[in-house]
């Protein structure tokens, strides 16, 4: 009898072990599938819908005018060692890395501009912390040699005006370069250190304004007929005949975001809050200087973390680019630009929404709970009967 009982127990034990293994396999498959989709494949699914805008091209000498494909993003705010929790770093930096690498692979831009505040603590970080942040940035925003990556100075990178120092600016420029003027495929870009546009005559501010006046002179020379002025005596070749695209961190002066609209504009309760000059936006005087000196055909800026489109006096349009990070908004995005020397077209590309990903994780957690409860038959009888009927129907 003892042998018979032992045999029956052993027979009952094997099906139980098989059921546990089946449950473990189901849970593993669901968890891995959800992780792969939410942390990897969703970026391809969402960014696959983005396309380069069409721009009118003119023929010169029997050849079509070249089109430059440029990406513009802003305010990545990589967290530092002081305010950055490790889980916050891991989550938000992985999101930006996957979004950027997917965009490079799918869209293949020729140049990428980041409009300031790439770091969150550059204004007070030590040299070692700065080196660590730079290393993380270079890993996240790695790119092939045929893609150019240009970065504009932001207030979190070197500090607000009264925190800014020559040392911090040199530290930034040592990594990201100091060029203010860039010409690609006949398109002129002017990258401004808008933190230095305080207008109080400080040494850094005076040097920045002097450099911008020199750029203004070069742009004016490009519009003159060769042989008709002193510009011909310049040792450097002339710039392409093209009104520049102005890139900076602070927006040009505007009273508020009251006239901004769209799903990624500032929340309605914040749009009528007046902006503070030299903190939220550039001062009126600094804005007028930039528009007068450079006469841009397009201005792109960051800083506010929200989208806005403004038409400035003289007809210069400005586009404020929203933050690229989930840390600053639920629906981050970037701008795609197709540019020629005479024309341009812009479109916006949204990244996966953070609440969508969190909802998917919540739904997956609920499904896992149901699997576990069904396995141990802890569901109320109506749910259990319904589950068994579904399984029976699926087998047929």
UniProtKB/Swiss-Prot annotation:
Subunit structure: Interacts with GPI-anchor proteins (via the GPI portion). Interacts with TMED10.
Family membership noted in the UniProt record: Belongs to the metallophosphoesterase superfamily. MPPE1 family.
Necessary cofactors: Mn(2+)
Function: Metallophosphoesterase that catalyzes the removal of a side-chain ethanolamine-phosphate (EtNP) from the second mannose of the GPI-anchor protein intermediate. Participates in the glycan remodeling steps of GPI-anchor maturation to allow an efficient transport of GPI-anchor proteins from the endoplasmic reticulum to the Golgi.
Gene3D superfamilies: 3.60.21.10
Subcellular location: Endoplasmic reticulum-Golgi intermediate compartment membrane
A GO MF label: manganese ion binding
SUPFAM superfamilies: Metallo-dependent phosphatases
InterPro entries named among the record's database cross-references: Calcineurin-like_PHP_ApaH, Metallo-depent_PP-like, MPP_MPPE1, PGAP5/Cdc1/Ted1
GO biological process, one term: GPI anchor biosynthetic process
Pfam families xrefs: Metallophos
Name of the featured protein: Metallophosphoesterase 1
Superkingdom of the source species: Eukaryota
The protein's Enzyme Commission number: 3.1.-.-
Topology within the bilayer: Multi-pass membrane protein
Principal location: endoplasmic reticulum
Binding-site list for a divalent metal cation 2: 75, 117, 249, 305
Note on how the cofactor is bound: Binds 2 manganese ions per subunit.
A Gene Ontology cellular-component term: nucleoplasm
Residues engaged in binding a divalent metal cation 1: 117, 155, 249, 303
């Amino acid at each position: 009898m003892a042998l018979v009982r032992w045999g029956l127990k052993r027979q009952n034990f094997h099906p139980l072990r098989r059921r546990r293994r089946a449950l473990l396999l189901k849970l593993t498959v669901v968890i891995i599938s959800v992780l792969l989709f939410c942390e990897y494949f969703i970026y391809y699914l969402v960014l696959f819908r983005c396309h380069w805008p069409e721009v009118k091209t003119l023929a010169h000498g029997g050849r079509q005018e070249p089109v430059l494909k440029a990406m513009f993003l802003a305010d990545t705010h990589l967290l530092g060692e002081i305010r950055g929790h490790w889980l916050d770093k891991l989550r938000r930096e992985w999101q930006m890395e996957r979004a950027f690498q997917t965009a490079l692979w799918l869209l293949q831009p020729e140049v990428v501009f980041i409009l300031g505040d790439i770091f969150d603590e550059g204004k007070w970080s030590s040299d070692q912390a700065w080196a660590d942040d730079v290393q993380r940035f270079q890993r996240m925003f790695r790119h092939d040699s045929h893609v150019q990556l240009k970065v504009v100075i932001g207030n979190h990178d070197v500090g607000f005006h009264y925190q800014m120092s020559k040392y911090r600016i040199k530290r930034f420029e040592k990594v990201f370069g100091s060029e203010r003027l860039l010409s690609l495929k006949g398109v002129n870009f002017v990258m401004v250190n808008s933190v230095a546009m305080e207008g109080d005559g400080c040494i850094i501010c005076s040097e920045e304004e002097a450099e911008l006046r020199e750029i203004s002179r070069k742009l004016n020379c490009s519009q003159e007929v060769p042989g008709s002025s002193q510009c011909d005596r310049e040792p450097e070749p002339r710039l392409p005949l093209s009104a520049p695209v102005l890139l900076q961190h602070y927006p040009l002066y505007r009273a508020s975001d009251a006239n901004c609209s769209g799903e990624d504009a500032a929340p309605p309760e914040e749009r009528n809050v007046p902006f503070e000059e030299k903190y939220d936006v550039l001062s009126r005087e600094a804005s007028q200087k930039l528009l007068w000196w450079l006469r841009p055909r397009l201005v792109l800026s960051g800083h506010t973390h929200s989208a806005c489109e403004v038409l400035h006096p003289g007809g210069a349009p400005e586009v404020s680019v929203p933050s690229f990070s989930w840390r600053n908004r639920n629906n981050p995005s970037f701008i795609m630009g197709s540019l020629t020397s005479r024309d341009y077209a812009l479109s916006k590309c949204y990244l996966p929404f953070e609440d969508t990903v969190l909802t998917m994780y919540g739904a997956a957690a609920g499904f896992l709970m149901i699997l576990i409860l069904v396995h141990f038959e802890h569901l109320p009888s109506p749910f259990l009967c319904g589950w068994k009927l579904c399984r029976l129907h699926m087998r047929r």
